[in-house]
Amino acid sequence: MRLPGEPRSVTRGVGKTGWARLVLRSAAAPQVPSTLGFMNAGPSLSLAEWTVLALISEHPTHGFAISRLTAPGGDLGKIWHIPRPVIYRTIGRLEEAELVAAQAVEPGRGPQRTIYAATPAGRKAAADWLDTPVQHIRDVRSQLLIKLALLDRAGTDPTGLLQRQKIILEPIASAISAERSQHKGFDATLLAWRRATAAAALSFLDDITPSAASRV
């Protein structure tokens, strides 16, 4: 049963050969034209699964520590809250997909907590995901902000990602503007909203992308 607030996942029931299945499934999904050169094939995971995988890829950790980061007041939870039960279920799915593996049990008198580490395939998948721009304007608020927060935690310069993100969103915004001129009534109203949202997303990217001078 899917818990309240838990994103739908395509990795439920993945067996020990799950990694291969995930790669095949994602390869069949629509992709941005290869001329852009920065789309990375990888497993098809939910945002919760990507977030947990990226955190485990930073260093070996356990579900309780991750749940503190994704709680409403946590570093990532203020962007995208992931309830603690979902964290543990997500770790289980990542383990089944061979993206993480149990490493040890945390010593001490408290509750026994299993420490997980990312597998080589898991680390590569997380790195590729963090380096890939989102494909929809609606994902800027969630996926892109999570990626930027994770890159900041790692001390990684996000400039390249932000520049590639603009390349993805600019033609989308232009297409929306062109389409709006062909409609009337509520359709035009809806497209006006989408155009304003696209413009806001591009303005946001301009605001946070360091200039060439500031990077010298």
PLM features per residue range, with description:
Residues M1-S44:
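Short, intrinsically disordered or compositionally biased N-terminal tails of bacterial proteins
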Residues P30-R138:
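Basic helix-turn-helix/winged-helix DNA-binding cores
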Residues A54, R68, D152, A199, ...:
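A cross-family signal for key residues in well-ordered alpha-helices
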Residues I82, G110-R113, D157, R164, ...:
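A structural signal for alpha-helical segments
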Residues A127-I167, P171-S174:
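Amphipathic alpha-helical dimerization/coiled-coil segments
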Residues L162, P171-V216:
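Charged, low-complexity intrinsically disordered regulatory/assembly segments
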